[in-house]
Amino acid sequence: MSGETNAPATSAQATGQPRTAGAASPDSAATVPGDLRMTRLLWPFMLASAAGLVPFTVYSTFLVPIADESGGGVAALGQLRGLGGLAALAVGSALAPLIDRVRREWAAAAGLAVLAASAALGASGDFLLLAAFCLLVGAGTAVLNPALTAAAADRFDNDAAAGRAATLITATQSLTALLAAPLVALPALVWGWRGDLWAIAALCSVLALYFLLRGRRKAGPGAEAEAAGKAGQPGYVESFRLLGTLPGVLPLVLVAMLRTAAFMGYLAYLAAFYDERFGLAPGPFAMVWTLSGTSFFLGNLFAGRLLSAERARISGERLMTLALVVALAALVGVFFTRSLWLSLPLTALVGAAHATVAACVTTLLVRRCGSLRGTALSVNAAGMSFGVFCGAGLGGAGLALGGFAGTAAALGGLTLVALVLARVVARSSTD
């Protein structure tokens, strides 16, 4: 039986009725396509997902020359980046129910159009327009990422394949985060950072047109059934209420938020830790950063593959709990170890464990939320944006109060709370 479908998945949740937690869908035993076949089907979604990460990568990579050009100073431009997180939180929360009420392709096209406009504004180098750039990038990705993830999941008619499709999108994002810096630095040798932004503006414009036309092509056979399904969707406020009644969904969103806060807080001070503890300069530390990024990508990729197996040896709830235990132990271990050769594998473990948790959250949200998955993924993305915003602050507070041991305590505490909530999610699957 083929796992692909051209219509959005339908379930009891299309009318707001939650599926019994832990219950398999009628076709959950269907064959899950291989990664290569999925990639051939989903490459436009994966490319758009990768493109969404590039604007801020250019901004971070060339922060010093951009600051010189704008006259705003490095510190001021660094603070502008926080505007993107706040915009993502606000837009993601406000528009979450709308992701399920419009065609996913059109939502993705809108997000890409906003990113194209933001890149064009950023290329000006003007301080105020750079502030607008940061706001628009945050807003655009808040719409783009959940729309792409939900659209990829909707291409398949069984839970295992839908979850795998969603995690392939997130794996693409982690791979892009790993490779984007050198990929934007090399072309910049020819056309500068402005050329990078104009190039991403052009790419996002082309992709926006592609998804717009793709959405229009769906107005053929089956469009009436899809329109009827959209008409049967709950209202704006009702979507939030129904999402809260689905078993384990709210704890899952909180797990994602806390995990993100802990991981981003850890990354914010990792370079300072390796410099103070082991005397690693920025050059050698780049290898540590690559190790962490590679571990995150591989953890996300293989966790998604494990969860999509036809006969998974471990449930998503149990794997998430185990990964949080590993993440907690490894994170605390990194900040307390005095050996570089012990710190390096612990750093890799932190990245792989957090990536596994991220894959589990995405998979479980896709499986549990049915036709409300777009709303759920958007709320989840907003929560993660809030986690990014809070993580560095909490890690810094711990550092100020107790050195790196204080940072370990603050971020480890967040992970511990996430672990408790993961057990709540696991219990909800058996209720």
Residues covered by each model-derived region:
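Extracytoplasmic gate region of multi-pass secondary transporters
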Residues: 60, 249-290, 297
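Conserved MFS/SLC helix-loop-helix module at the cytosolic interface between two early adjacent transmembrane helices
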Residues: 90-125
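Helix-to-loop junctions at the C-terminal end of transmembrane segments
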Residues: 91-103, 299-314, 399
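Juxtamembrane intracellular "pre-TM" segments in multi-pass secondary transporters
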Residues: 26-36, 215-253
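Cytoplasmic helix-loop-helix junction between adjacent transmembrane helices
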Residues: 134-172
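Helix-loop-helix hairpin linking two adjacent transmembrane segments in secondary transporters
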Residues: 127, 159, 167-216
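A late C-terminal transmembrane helix in Major Facilitator Superfamily
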Residues: 368-404, 411
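C-terminal transmembrane helical hairpin of 12-TM major facilitator-type secondary transporters
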Residues: 314-361
